[in-house]
């Protein structure tokens, strides 16, 4: 019998009315701290979006309290077992939006959104020829893993997606549109925006990639790579049948699923690289970042000017 791990990570969201997000955030933070949870929760007038970790007992108490609050009636928690906390601290922050689209005329998913497809239906729809699959996440999320045949919008943040669609509308014309994201929250708005733009056949993966990977029937099939998550785990598996690595090392192009942030704090770009290349390239995405006086790798490892110069010389010699 499989042993249960001592911790859990909860992923959830709900579009619901929260009258005073600032007041709610302060009270909710105190509540989460009383349970000794750690995580990141965003609160807006339009609802709540959170990931938090704790022991089985702590997370049970949290879910029970949320389920007993009429504002969160019907909320769905996606649960991962874990060996420890997935966060260092607990943050609950009020925001103007749960996901940042910054539309002049905002989308209310209760009023307009794409058709919900359960994992099995989404799986079948992906195999149809007249279908286009749009990844509603950012480029670095796509690079770690995505559905086979999915289109990668060239965007660094969610708010860039509507403009990208308008600039590439010929891809979607006359097609059935499928869209997906990590847990479903971005697609609720994005698919609604597509419907408002006049696209008639728009569907979204209900519960997102996380739900798809746990579904006992599809078992994550047609997914390549891993799923990027916004906590200390960074990546979680999806496809239970086969593991295909799609990520490529920033420096060598070799298969890689290990993300680090560029050591120049002014850049902070997410790059895939091996431990070996992290050391070789001083965890910096470019020469400019390597020679930054604020290079965090150099500071962290207390490298001397001579050691940095030798590393730069070696990189130059191998070009």
From Swiss-Prot:
Start and end residues of each Rhodanese domain: 127-221
UniProt keyword terms in alphabetical order: Oxidoreductase, tRNA processing
GO molecular function: oxidoreductase activity, acting on paired donors, with incorporation or reduction of molecular oxygen
SUPFAM superfamilies per the UniProt record, alphabetical: Rhodanese/Cell cycle control phosphatase
Xref: InterPro entries: Rhodanese-like_dom, Rhodanese-like_dom_sf, Rhodanese_C, TrhO, TRHO_N
Pfam family, one: Rhodanese_C
Catalysed reaction equations from the record: uridine(34) in tRNA + AH2 + O2 = 5-hydroxyuridine(34) in tRNA + A + H2O
SMART domains per record: RHOD
Enzyme Commission no: 1.14.-.-
UniProt record, GO biological process: tRNA modification
Active site positions: 181 (cysteine persulfide intermediate)
Protein function: Catalyzes oxygen-dependent 5-hydroxyuridine (ho5U) modification at position 34 in tRNAs.
Family listed: Belongs to the TrhO family.
Protein name: tRNA uridine(34) hydroxylase
